[in-house]
């Protein structure tokens, strides 16, 4: 059983538009042919990014010239996907799979696949791969690479298993995706899960097992169960997102970028990206490089990705916020970038850092110890230059420099680190070390003391204790004195922003869009019904609270450092000590506690006692 007659009529594919036309036709079917589409994309990518030299020893292979926009009068060449080439590759793949899997040995009760059958298909793909190759190399994600080079990367293996299952008529087997891993779901309503590929250094022994253990340990790799369960159209979107346009470290294929952008817009228009936050971020990045007339701007697409994560995945995806922060960083929007990174840390704080989460650790490490310090360093230089030569800078440059005079930016920086510290609490692997502390001190030092002191850090525990004490005093002394000052309900609190709910329907700082929030307020770090309270603590009548953002820390480390963080002069030694000390001894707690109970009492000892 090969290609259908309707599919054959679309060949040969001589241009980007021809490939888009093929995808549109397949997406119009109930079951788009994953094998066909992956072979076509792999073929085009190979001759546009891997082997750009026009071969003379393959008579069936030709290249279609077309005018190039740059330089004027130049030509660009597109590899012609002839029917004979694609049909031969298609027949080879389907014959290999059907010849190796005897479906009669695996009864399908109720028309659903068994774990043994899924494991068998994954064995066929796995055992067909080369024994030794660099598994992180580029351009080995498609079935074209599998057939012609017997090489696949990690997610490519998972996709190949799904494509093979479709070729066998197993319609219940679908791709499952987290932000750094892939496996399959199958059975009634996709309730069963099975590992089919490796992750990181390789976990061959996990193939066939469920992902329940990873979900239970609250690792980012499995997103606490909030992973994507793809249908066939989303699996097409996955292969489009997997297109790698890089020719080398410094050059991308313009044709592949255009092809990916057009295919993503096709999927967007058909509604197949609604549940795919990372695809929306990918499309936004492409639009930033080359805007499409009449289409939504990149910022709108980034926010759509965040909205998708909130609506369908309990706001437990990291990369939608990373995409947004990267956009603002590239455009030197310091305040917005810091806010998006803080929102990213607010999401990660509810995970446990596990051994296989090294990819997201590297992301946060780079942001905290490279990107943010350099962004603030540049802002400091612009601020200094503006003070020396006032009136010579553009409004955007002035805005970038003035970020260091904005207490709201400082509050976002603290919220970012608060999320990282909370992420570490209860985790089996420490996160923070002295390298983090060094750059934290450096970033704190970019803000003047009077700016830092405008941020008001409150503690719900302190508020509760003070309220309890006040009620006790009222009971004892109510008959002996007049009403307390705190009992005046008509006395309005200082302006503040209400707490942001991170649930599926809740708002988020990064989702507020163009309207600016009231000055002097930032969202708290907590998520869900009980988190993020930004209400100020009752202040003594003699010292009214300072104007500025109000922030509630969630992590015990940041709570222990709150006086140091807003002090007039930064005590770098004390900050470094307190940020790293618990990381060194967190597995030797003095009492049995839940993951959220994270005592820092030993940090109050004298230095010689440590």
Swiss-Prot record:
- Enumerate the subcellular locations listed in this protein's record, separating them with semicolons: Nucleus
Annotated region described as Interaction with FANCD2, given as residue ranges:
214-390
Which positions carry Phosphothreonine? 594
Q: Name one GO biological process term.
A: chromatin organization
The family database entries (Pfam families) matched by this protein are listed as: Menin
What GO terms are given for molecular function?
A: chromatin binding; transcription cis-regulatory region binding; Y-form DNA binding
Q: How does it assemble?
A: Component of the MLL-HCF complex, at least composed of KMT2A/MLL1, MEN1, ASH2L, RBBP5, DPY30, WDR5, HCFC1 and HCFC2. Component of the menin-associated histone methyltransferase complex, at least composed of KMT2B/MLL4, MEN1, ASH2L, RBBP5, DPY30 and WDR5. Interacts with POLR2B. Interacts with POLR2A phosphorylated at 'Ser-5', but not with the unphosphorylated, nor 'Ser-2' phosphorylated POLR2A forms. Interacts with FANCD2 and DBF4. Interacts with SMAD3, but not with SMAD2, nor SMAD4. Directly interacts with NFKB1, NFKB2 and RELA.
What's the name of the protein? Menin
């Amino acid at each position: 059983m090969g290609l259908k007659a309707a599919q054959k009529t679309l060949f040969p594919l001589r241009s980007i538009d021809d490939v888009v036309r093929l995808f549109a036709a397949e997406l119009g079917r109930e079951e788009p042919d994953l094998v066909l589409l992956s072979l076509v994309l792999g073929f085009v990518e190979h001759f546009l990014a891997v082997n750009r030299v026009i071969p003379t020893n393959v008579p069936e292979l030709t290249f279609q010239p077309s005018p190039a926009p740059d330089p004027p009068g130049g030509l660009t060449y597109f590899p012609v996907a002839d029917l004979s080439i694609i049909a031969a590759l298609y027949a080879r793949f389907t014959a290999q799979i059907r010849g190796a899997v005897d479906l009669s040995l695996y009864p399908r009760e109720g028309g659903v696949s068994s774990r043994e059958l899924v494991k068998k298909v994954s064995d066929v793909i796995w055992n067909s791969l080369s024994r030794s190759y660099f598994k992180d190399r580029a351009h080995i994600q498609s079935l074209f690479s599998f057939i012609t080079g017997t090489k696949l990367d990690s997610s490519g293996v998972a996709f190949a298993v799904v494509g093979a299952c479709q070729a066998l008529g197993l319609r219940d087997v679908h791709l499952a995706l987290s932000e750094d891993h892939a496996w399959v779901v199958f059975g009634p309503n996709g309730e069963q899960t099975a590992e089919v590929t490796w992750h990181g250094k390789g976990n061959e022994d996990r193939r066939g097992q469920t992902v329940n253990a990873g979900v239970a340990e609250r690792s980012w790799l499995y997103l606490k169960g909030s992973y994507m369960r793809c249908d066939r159209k989303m699996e097409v979107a996955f292969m489009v997102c997997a297109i790698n346009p890089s020719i080398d470290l410094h050059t991308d294929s313009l044709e592949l970028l255009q092809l990916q952008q057009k295919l993503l817009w096709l999927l967007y228009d058909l509604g197949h990206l609604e549940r795919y936050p990372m695809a929306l971020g990918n499309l936004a990045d492409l639009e930033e490089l080359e805007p499409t007339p009449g289409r939504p701007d990149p910022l709108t697409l980034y926010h759509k990705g965040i909205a998708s994560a909130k609506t369908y995945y309990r706001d437990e995806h990291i990369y939608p916020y990373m995409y947004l922060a990267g956009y603002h960083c590239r455009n030197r929007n310091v305040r917005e970038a810091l806010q998006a990174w803080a929102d990213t840390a607010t999401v990660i704080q509810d995970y446990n850092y596990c051994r296989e989460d090294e990819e997201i650790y590297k992301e946060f490490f780079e942001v905290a110890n490279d990107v943010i310090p350099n962004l603030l360093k540049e802002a400091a230089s612009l601020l200094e230059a503006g003070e020396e030569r006032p009136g010579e800078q553009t409004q955007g440059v002035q805005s970038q420099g003035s970020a260091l005079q904005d207490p709201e930016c400082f509050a976002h920086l603290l919220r970012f680190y608060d999320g990282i510290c909370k992420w570490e609490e209860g985790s089996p692997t420490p996160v923070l070390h002295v390298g983090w502390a060094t750059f934290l001190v450096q970033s704190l030092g970019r803000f003047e003391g009077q700016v830092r002191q405008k941020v008001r850090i409150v503690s719900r525990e302190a508020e509760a204790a003070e309220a309890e004490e006040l009620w006790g005093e009222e009971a004892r002394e109510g008959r002996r004195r007049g009403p307390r000052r705190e009992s005046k309900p008509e006395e309005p609190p200082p302006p503040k922003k209400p707490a942001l709910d991170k649930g599926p329907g809740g708002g988020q700082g990064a989702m507020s869009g163009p309207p600016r929030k009231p000055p002097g307020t930032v969202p708290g770090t907590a998520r869900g019904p009980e988190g993020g309270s930004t209400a100020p603590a009752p202040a003594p009548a003699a010292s009214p609270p300072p104007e500025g953002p109000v922030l509630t820390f969630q992590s015990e480390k940041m709570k222990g450092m709150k006086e140091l963080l807003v002090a007039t002069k930064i005590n770098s030694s004390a900050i470094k000590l307190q940020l790293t000390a618990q990381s060194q001894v967190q597995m030797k707690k003095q009492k049995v506690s839940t993951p959220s109970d994270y005592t820092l009492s030993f940090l109050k000892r004298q230095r010689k006692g440590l």
